[in-house]
């Protein structure tokens, strides 16, 4: 049925009027060319696509039917790119076909990429526009091409809809589409807050882990259509101005510099998410921007993004002065801006006064470090340092010139047969190792009561006299010493106690092993508090017996110093010989021998013979310091009535006390009666025999 003539005239007038409102962008051969349309088609190889002639969708106010009724025809051309030769398209009607104002590809091939120009014309009018089609392949291992994605942004904690884009041509109006959604090309168990509506995916509350690539898949005929959208999550849109981090707002920051040096003023600020707006940060001097200053030596660096997270950024910009001059000194301000406001902070570039703060601080720091090192070395090696100094530069003690002995050794004498497994090492140390090391190796002159005590009065008075003649008092705290209360002698005698309390003598207390669980140890603690000058040295077992151990160094440090060569003790010398310890000849043994000889001089022959054998068998037992022998005269007439297990004091010839024998006759040639004419045994008082003879 033909349209009435008035209707055709009206349609043509309307179409002509609509063309007048469009501005020409190019004209060639009388045809208006609108170049390439803004809409670009991007599909994956194998997918169907419909390319519409853009002239009917934005360039002219008519559609394909009206244009065709007005006598205009639609032609399609293809070219490889802008300016290339355009050739008419021959439609085969199957894979590529022309349907009204569109071209259908079912499916697309890689060679279909290019520019498709649609032209509407008649004999007097022509208009043209080109449409871009890109056919690509999936990225390796993915279900999409990264150059063909759509992009969406969502704010944290807000809702967001992701649409399956450009699928209108594949939807049927009478049927709901069956769309599958993937994230990163994988099926996913979606949380309840994610809802699917027709061709959209709704996230009701966006989280940071929602960032990623979302792919929708739709089946169309025998083909599959996929669209991929990359979702970016940002922080909520800020409603605050930027925050200055340095320099601090409302506070003047002073930066010192020297003339001729370069200066660098750095401004840092935090910008909340403001959409696609770039952060605005800059420096000013007074009312001038830095680029407006006449000096080329002063310039701004580029804006640097230090940190970025969910669209929020920490940025910085530096103001550099290459060579500072007097005119460069002054106040500089850093400004930061966004759509919500502006902030600024100031820095005063100040000339530094000449001060040697760094040098002074470095010198003091070096001195302090040196002092710390010296103190540490002194704390760790105090004894070694003091011994070295004393051995090379020290002087002997003057206050001990009137003393005869370097130390008085107080110990508990225990027969080796009575040593047990637990205390054997302690007793051996006290009786053998300690005196042997002090005398033989270090050359000290010790007073050992069991060896050197010369009875002149009561036992306690003798001990007090000998302690008074010693520069040090060494108390060896072995378990037996504690059990037998060996220190009680220093509490009974007033003179001894006063010496300890007033500090007249320095006491060296050697503790062997752990003594706290031993009976009477509480009294030992009380004794420590009584002594004024006390040094406690721990002996930790056989490992302390080594010459280079801390124990011997500590003991040597506490002993008096004197320049003396170490001496070696030998066996007892002959009576006619004088050794290095001639003045220390054992008195207890000699005095016992003298007393015994005096008693036997007048004893009955049978008694004398019996005692002679017994005495010599005892005297030849091992002595722990020196061994002395004295041949007892075989004759005597004095009955033996006072010899017992207690101390026996006697009158001894002075030549015998000095360790000498008469030179005129040998002891074997001398008449026993003549040798002991002036000797007699003196009985002891009961109070003198009340002290145990094993404590010295």
From Swiss-Prot:
Keywords (alphabetical) are: Cell membrane, Cell projection, Cytoplasm, Disulfide bond, Glycoprotein, Hydrolase, Immunoglobulin domain, Membrane, NAD, Receptor, Repeat, Signal, Transmembrane, Transmembrane helix
Residues on the membrane's Cytoplasmic side span: 379-696
Provide the topology term for how it sits in the membrane.
Single-pass type I membrane protein
The residue range of the signal peptide is 1-18
GO BP annotations, alphabetical order: negative regulation of exocytosis; positive regulation of synapse assembly; regulation of neuron projection development; signal transduction
Where is the major localization of this protein? membrane
Q: List the disulfide bonds.
A: 31-126, 53-118, 143-185, 164-216, 267-334
Topology: which residues are Extracellular?
A: 19-357
Q: Give positions of region: Interaction with NCS1.
A: 549-644
EC identifiers of the protein: 3.2.2.6
Q: Which GO terms describe its molecular function?
A: NAD+ nucleosidase activity, cyclic ADP-ribose generating
What class does this enzyme belong to in the EC scheme? hydrolase
Give the Basic and acidic residues compositional bias ranges.
666-676
Query: Where does the record place it?
Result: Cell membrane; Cytoplasm; Cell projection, Axon; Cell projection, Dendrite
Q: Site (Essential for interaction with PTPRD): give the residues.
A: 34
Q: What is this protein called?
A: Interleukin-1 receptor accessory protein-like 1
Organism, as annotated? Pongo pygmaeus (Bornean orangutan)
């Amino acid at each position: 049925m033909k349209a009435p003539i008035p209707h055709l005239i009206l349609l043509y007038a309307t179409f002509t009027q609509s063309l007048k409102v469009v501005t020409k962008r190019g004209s060639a051969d009388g045809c208006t060319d609108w170049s390439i349309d803004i809409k670009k088609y991007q599909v994956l190889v194998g997918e169907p696509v419909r390319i519409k002639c853009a002239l009917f969708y934005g360039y002219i106010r008519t559609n394909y039917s009206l244009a065709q009724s007005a006598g205009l025809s639609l032609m399609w051309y293809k070219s490889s790119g802008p300016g290339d030769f355009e050739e008419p398209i021959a439609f085969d009607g199957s894979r590529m076909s022309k349907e009204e104002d569109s071209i259908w590809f079912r499916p697309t091939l890689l060679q279909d990429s290019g520019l498709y120009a649609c032209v509407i014309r008649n004999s007097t009018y022509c208009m043209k526009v080109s449409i871009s089609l890109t056919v690509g392949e999936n990225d390796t291992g993915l279900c999409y091409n990264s150059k063909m994605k759509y992009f969406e942004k969502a704010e944290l904690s807000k809702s967001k809809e992701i649409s399956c884009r450009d699928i209108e041509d594949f939807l049927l109006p009478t049927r709901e589409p069956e769309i599958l959604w993937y994230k990163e090309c994988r099926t996913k168990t979606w949380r309840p807050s994610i809802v699917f509506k027709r061709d959209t995916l709704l996230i009701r509350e966006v989280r940071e882990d929602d960032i990623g690539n979302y792919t929708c898949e739709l089946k169309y005929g025998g083909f599959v259509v996929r669209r991929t959208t990359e979702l970016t999550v940002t922080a909520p849109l800020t409603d605050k101005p930027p925050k200055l981090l340095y320099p601090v707002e409302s506070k003047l920051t002073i930066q010192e510099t020297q003339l001729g040096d370069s200066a660098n003023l750095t401004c840092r600020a935090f910008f909340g998410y403001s959409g696609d707006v770039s952060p605005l940060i800059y420096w000013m001097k007074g009312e001038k921007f830095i680029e407006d200053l006449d000096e080329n030596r002063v310039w701004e660096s580029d804006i640097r993004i230090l940190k970025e997270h969910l669209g929020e950024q920490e940025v910085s910009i530096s103001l550099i002065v290459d060579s500072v001059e007097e005119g460069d000194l002054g106040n500089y301000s850093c400004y930061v801006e966004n759509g919500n406001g502006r902030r600024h902070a100031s820095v005063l570039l100040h000339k530094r006064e000449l001060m040697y703060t760094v040098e002074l601080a470095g010198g003091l720091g070096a001195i302090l470090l040196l002092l710390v090192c010296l103190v540490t070395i002194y704390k760790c090696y105090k004894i070694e340092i003091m011994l070295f100094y004393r051995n090379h530069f020290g002087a002997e003690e003057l206050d001990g010139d009137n003393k005869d002995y370097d130390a008085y050794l107080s110990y508990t004498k225990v027969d080796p047969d009575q040593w047990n497994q637990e205390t054997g090492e302690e007793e051996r140390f006290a009786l053998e190792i300690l005196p042997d090391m002090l005398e033989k190796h270090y050359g000290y002159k010790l007073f050992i009561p069991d060896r050197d005590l010369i009875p002149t009065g009561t036992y306690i008075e003798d001990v007090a006299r000998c302690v008074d003649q010693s520069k040090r008092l060494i108390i060896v705290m072995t378990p037996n010493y504690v059990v037998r209360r060996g220190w009680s002698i220093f509490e009974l005698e007033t003179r001894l106690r006063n010496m300890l309390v007033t500090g007249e003598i320095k006491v060296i207390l050697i503790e062997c092993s752990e003594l706290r669980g031993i009976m009477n140890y509480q009294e030992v603690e009380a004794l420590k508090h009584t002594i004024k000058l006390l040094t406690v040295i721990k002996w930790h077992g056989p490992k302390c017996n080594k010459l280079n151990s801390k124990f011997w160094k500590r003991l040597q440090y506490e002993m008096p110093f004197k320049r003396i060569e170490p001496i070696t003790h030998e066996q007892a010398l002959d009576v006619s010989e004088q050794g290095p310890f001639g003045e220390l000849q054992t008195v207890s043994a000699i005095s016992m021998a003298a007393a015994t000889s005096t008693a036997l001089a007048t004893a009955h022959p049978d008694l004398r013979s019996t005692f002679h054998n017994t005495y010599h068998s005892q005297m030849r037992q091992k002595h722990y310091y020196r061994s002395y022998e004295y041949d007892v005269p075989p004759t005597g007439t004095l009955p033996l009535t006072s010899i017992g297990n207690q101390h026996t004091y006697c009158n001894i010839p002075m030549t015998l006390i000095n360790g000498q024998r008469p030179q005129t006759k040998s002891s074997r040639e001398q008449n026993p009666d003549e040798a002991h004419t002036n000797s007699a045994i003196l009985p002891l008082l009961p109070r003198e025999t009340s002290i145990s003879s094993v404590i010295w």
